[in-house]
Amino acid sequence: MKLSEIALKVDATFSGEDLEIFALNSLKNANKAELTYCDGEKNAKFISTSNAGAILVTKSLLDLVPAGMVALVCDNPHLAFAILSKIYAKPLFCEPKPSNIAQSATIMPNVYIGSNVSVGENTIVMAGAFLGDNVTIGKNCIIHPNVVIYNDCVIGNECHLLANCVIGSDGFGYAHTKTGEHVKIYHNGNVVLGDFVEIGACTTIDRGVFESTMIANYTKIDNLVQIGHNCELGNGCLIVSQTGLAGSTVLGRNVVMGGQSGSAGHVKVGDFAQIAARGGVSKDLPGGKKYAGAYPIMELSEQFKFQAKILRFFKKN
């Protein structure tokens, strides 16, 4: 689609070459044939280093757009991006292509296998599972009943996916109009699981908007956990039941998230950190320490002192 057509669809103005745009992408990864966006000062510093062919920006950020990149100026770049994401969304079903199922793999009855699926040696796929188009599953995996693996997702070797878990569903992302309507952002990324990963029953892992939601080797995730879009979990993490990680959370290696704990979006937790049950991570946390509480979260030893002070206060009063 030409920039002139895009501008009409999102009520934007531009001057410069009327480029053909083939996809949407992030500021960091967009190329000359792709369109990106920036909707605030937080990410404005990345505009000058982006390789995007064109960018959606507000008038206030126009001076930051480098030469050679076409600026589409609009009131709400995030909303414009959401509108365009539907146009550039991948199709639900691909053209039929043969799949590659290892002879030693076991496929039980009532399994749906899409186009161009690969299933490795000695992997077992139990009844009722759904394997979307272009899914890759490594060797020696066990895919339990009614597991859903959506298009383009990658499962490593020796993985266990327990019943009813969902890998690669759309993330929870919306832009908002002035009249209160919520406009869906379509997700074109995927989910990548490393080797020896276990995903508990009824856990959901959302696909990335552009790139991959990443679960590294040896990470174990309990039942009823929600992993948001674009999260990155390092090697050997332990995620206990009812934990929720908001989008773009980054966990280092061997991080432990206790039961019913959670994180705000775009936070980083360092290697070997431990978050106690019901802990709420609202800011970046250094590794190698134990944390508890929510507002504010603090080191476990400080949390004990804080609770003791509260008890002493009420005893005095």
Curated annotation (Swiss-Prot):
Q: Which keywords does this chain's UniProt record carry?
A: Acyltransferase, Lipid A biosynthesis, Lipid biosynthesis, Lipid metabolism, Repeat, Transferase
Q: Which InterPro entries match?
A: Hexapep, LpxD, Trimer_LpxA-like_sf, UDP_GlcNAc_AcTrfase_non-rep
Q: Name one GO biological process term.
A: lipid A biosynthetic process
Entry's transmembrane regions: none
UniProt GO MF annotations: N-acyltransferase activity
State the active site. H229 (proton acceptor)
Gene3D superfamilies xrefs: Hexapeptide repeat proteins, MurE/MurF, N-terminal domain
Q: In which pathway does it act?
A: Bacterial outer membrane biogenesis; LPS lipid A biosynthesis
The protein's annotated catalytic reaction(s) are: a UDP-3-O-[(3R)-3-hydroxyacyl]-alpha-D-glucosamine + a (3R)-hydroxyacyl-[ACP] = a UDP-2-N,3-O-bis[(3R)-3-hydroxyacyl]-alpha-D-glucosamine + holo-[ACP] + H(+)
Q: What is its EC number?
A: 2.3.1.191
Query: Where does this protein have coiled-coil stretches?
Result: none
GO cellular component terms?
membrane
Name of one Pfam family that matches: Hexapep
| Subunit structure of this chain's protein | Homotrimer.
Which PANTHER family does its entry note? UDP-3-O-ACYLGLUCOSAMINE N-ACYLTRANSFERASE (PTHR43378), UDP-3-O-ACYLGLUCOSAMINE N-ACYLTRANSFERASE 1, MITOCHONDRIAL-RELATED (PTHR43378:SF2)
What does the function comment of this entry state? Catalyzes the N-acylation of UDP-3-O-acylglucosamine using 3-hydroxyacyl-ACP as the acyl donor. Is involved in the biosynthesis of lipid A, a phosphorylated glycolipid that anchors the lipopolysaccharide to the outer membrane of the cell.
Family label: Belongs to the transferase hexapeptide repeat family. LpxD subfamily.
Q: Which NCBIfam families match?
A: lipid_A_lpxD, PRK00892.1
This protein is called what? UDP-3-O-acylglucosamine N-acyltransferase
Q: Which organism is it from?
A: Campylobacter concisus (strain 13826)
